Amino acid sequence: MKLRMDDLTWQEIDGELVILDLQGSVYLTTNAAGAFLTKLLTEERSEGELTDALIAEYRIDRETAERDVDAFVAQLKDQDLLA
């Protein structure tokens, strides 16, 4: 999966990310982990790769990382932000 780049703009503020979809008028804010995952999704990534990266970056257990990645990906899909 990969972030849909057309008509998206974002700004990082104090470690959080604000994403604006100019096409669909979608406004999304993320925490630091969401900002980290969003940046990874500028290139094609699997959920497993995102999970592994989250574990390495934040030193959390696999179950927590999988749950967080699943929730974040679901949110991006709901907002039609994935290519």
What name fits each language-model region?
Residues 13, 26-83:
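Long, charge-rich, low-complexity alpha-helical segments
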Residues 1-22:
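Long, low-complexity, charged/polar intrinsically disordered regions in eukaryotic proteins
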